[in-house]
Swiss-Prot record:
Protein name: Redox-sensing transcriptional repressor Rex 2
Keywords tagged on the record: Cytoplasm, DNA-binding, NAD, Repressor, Transcription, Transcription regulation
Description of how the protein assembles with itself and partners: Homodimer.
Location in the cell: Cytoplasm
Keyword rRNA-binding annotated: no
Function: Modulates transcription in response to changes in cellular NADH/NAD(+) redox state.
Major place of residence: cytoplasm
Amino acid sequence: MEKKMPKATAKRLPVYLRYLKMLGDSGVKRIKSREFSEMIQIPSATIRRDFSHVGELGRSGYGYDVPYLIEVFSNILNTQEEKRIALIGCGNLGKALLKNNFRRNENLNIVCAFDNDSALVGTTINGLLVHDMSELEAFVRQEGVTVAISTVPSHHAQKAIDKIVQAGVTAILNFAPDRVSVPANVSVQYIDLTTELQTLIYFNETFSLANSPKQ
């Protein structure tokens, strides 16, 4: 890929790969963009544009070779390499993530968990011992951690993120919606459930108004 891939395109790649693997598991060898569009509910023009950032992946009238696309997107997303993850914050959300631990993605693995609550430190969740935050840096080195997930509330998020960065982790998924300050070499992805819900409600109500009977 010679030109930089747009962020919106990059965010859709895991979706494409997930559905391509489903097609592959079902024995499908070839699919056209229109059929793929109907399956994943993304406009076919968007799919073709996204794929063009990767390379010449299909032929007009033929469609896309499913096994080949799986190989291409797997290589781009580096799914063959295990990503060892540290979870910071073992409250209700943290516990849910530990219990799930990305069962559908073999290369994503939470290998250590941390909290500063003495009531949680020393307990075991889904086979993982919860450690004190003071041990984070040592475990990052010991376990080869490259990614961190923070479920720490907004008012404590910056302090938690600072410790994650200090430990040497440069990829962070943050469940606190407020933006945090990080060095230029650190990537932070935010999960803001309130914003997602408000956006959903807006589009639902807008669609309902547009399709309501005229008085």
